[in-house]
Amino acid sequence: MKRFFCVAITVALFSVSATAQEKFPWQDTSLSRTERVENLLSMLTPEEKVGLMMNKSISIDRLGIPSYNWWSEACHGVRQGGYTVYPQPIGLAAAFSEKLVYDVFSQVSDEARANWNRTDHNDPKLFNVPMGVTYYPGNPELTFWCPNVNIFRDPRWGRGQETCGEDPYLNAVLGVQTVLGMQGNNDKYFKTHACAKHYAVHSGPEPLRHSMNVDPSNRDLWETYLPAFKALVKKANVREVMCAYQRFEGKPCCTSDRLLIDILRNKWGYDAIVLTDCDAINNFFNRGQHETHKDGLSASVDAVLNGTDLECGKVFMSLTEGLKKGLIEESVLDQHLRKTLMGRFELGMFDPAEMLPWANLGPEVISSEKNNDMATQAARESMVLLENKGNVLPLSKSLKTIAVVGPNADDIELLNGNYGGTPTDNHKHSLLEGIKNAVPGTKIIYQKACELNDEYQTVHHLQDFNDGKGVLVEFWNSEQSPFEGETPAPVKTGYYNELNFSTFGAWGFAEGVSNDNIAVRISGKYTATFTGEMKYTLSSDNGYVLKVNGQVVEENKGGGRPRGFGFGRRVEYKSFPVEQGKDYDVVIEYRRGKGQFAMLRGDICERKLVDFTDLANEVKQADAIIIIGGISARMEGEGGDKQDIELPKVQQMLVKAMHSTGKPVVFVNCSGSAIAFGSVEGQYDALLQAWYPGQGGAKALADVLFGDYCPGGKLPVTFYRSNNDLPDFLDYSMKNRTYRYFTGVPQYAFGYGLSYTTFSVGKGKMTAKSAKIGKSDKPYSVVVVPVTNTGKCEGTETVQVYVKRLGDEGAPIKALKGFQKLTLKPGETKRAVIALNSEAFEYYDDAIDELAVKPGRYQILYGTSSLDKDLQSFDFTVK
């Protein structure tokens, strides 16, 4: 009965409005898609055409076409709450496994389709939707703005965690698998749309992306910044490409004829949708941003004429005026609208459900145990063992006492990273919980010890308000301020011990509270438990008012970047005096601004300088100490970057204090980027890079720490020794950046990663030592490398092949061109077989403004990391 019910509902939900079925030729599935698109296009008014060229596409009620929101996210799982959360892409990249990435994103798209199947697409709310409505993502649809295939050129960039690292080849091959997994392998329909973003040359600094210009050399453009985009277009048939915020060669990317027409359309033959990042068109004319256009009309017309099909925003509404003034022809709009309409037909939005291959995917797929198992396995494969002195790891499960300390140990939100969804409650487990579950007979001493990046201990007092109930929070959805005149009843109230509200996540500010016209009042009585300065920190998108005993302590009118929002910046604390035993009535009032997102976060607390003396004495009874630290997506993400790459000072202090105990110290680093450990080198016995591992991270980490899984991950980025190794963040030249151009000595190299077992890499062979330039599908040569597991446990080793062009000063020092992951039992030998095709020998040719195979002498290097000591080589010639 259950199976029949799901399928029956699905058939109803996939169809367009019943009042419009079988009325028009565009609904006739016996016609070609091109014929159907042309028929639908012919029935639309100019205003309707414009309304369909924006992210929140209007409904065409007379034709039975519901509104559609093109914006959904699936960076490492469907972003909304209740879906499986996999490791961040930077962690998936560390697995060096094309199959793993494909399998993960096949599950992601399954969950997306299952959600689409259970959604009522004839809901009256989807009709009578005019132009200019709010376009924030709500219920996920079928078009997902992933993957991010920008090059992680600088470890300070906040969004590097969304990418597959610093190497163009690795980004390309894993990006291709992401797209194939998302879009499915059906010949007639796409399961979902993937989107290659942010096209192109986009990697921070985040605060400047709406106003900056980048002008890389043509060589860097073609050899570093474009290869992944080219691969997604030509090898994966990606159906959406997002143009980036910044200017490229003086023009906003969304008006760059070179990027969008010359390269994307003409050179690569791209035939699908180009869309903007959200509010990117506004940047063209907003004061203090690009200021390349005088107004929204000129910006919109220019964007469309130069290759942009769909806007995330509302500025394209002005295209109706452009039509009337003759600034743009309706036939031009038709050229662009054809692509977006074709996209909806290709997704099966206008076809009966029984025609679609995924109609049987029901809600049971979403956050299933099968998907949780995949998320856990992906997390295992993502972890990279960087140090293991004296084989401290794996830890014995028979240890009597283990100390677990550090700011990330018991933080469940940490696991999700940037652009992460929220797993179901049964899949929410902290890393600390995973350790406890793995060794139930072991005594665990736990202390948070410190905050991520703060040398002061914070004593929180929100829970002490209102006689221990916490602060009272009242929520309104009202166009009028509820703080002036007669106060309407709030839509929701509750007592809270934390202030952390935003329109991100499953419920927005709170369940039952709309994201529109939000107003919040926080209030309570506090009886002071000390005499001194009570600290507070507040940050919001639109300011706030703080009152104590009826007096305004601070009125923040908003504007500018919210303070205290992490991203490597120090939280700003202010204060008001308190006296022990006295009562203080505190009120905070906030209203949502007009920006893209809403946010109100804060705390009321004491601040004391940290001292680890007592902690060090306490953990001396432990047999081993596990520090779970690093950073979190609160310190790196969209909108903000890390200020530096050093391990935060307070954690340096913690590491040194734990090392002073004489006990084995294992440091588990959680981050989406490279962290410099030079300041504490030699102060830890083992170092494990865990990234942001998703909902399976707790079990995965425990499996690795206690030997149930042998780590085999490899770094997809370079771990530098200090900030001094980094060029200017604003400089988009690749000189001295990433392993391909870095002339210094890294702390941990790209491609590096240890195991609990040992491997011997034998002498490799090549099927050919030279090749002739010419058109051929055959590889130029195949590298065959024997690998033997010489240790005592099963493990994986990844053979990597790099190419170096000799006699070319501007070429990379070496560049990854192939890899193969081998799983070997003790004593077993297998061969890695890695083909090098013509693309492995392509470099920029200014005569054709494109990549081309270059004749000359090459070195083919193979081994287990990018370090010279781990590589052997062949000579190779291209004639």
Question: Model features per residue range: what roles?
Answer:
Residues 16-535, 539-843, 850-868, 877-879:
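Glycoside hydrolase catalytic-domain context in secreted enzymes
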Residues 872:
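A conserved ligand/cofactor-binding region detector
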Residues 1-23:
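Bacterial Sec-dependent N-terminal signal peptides
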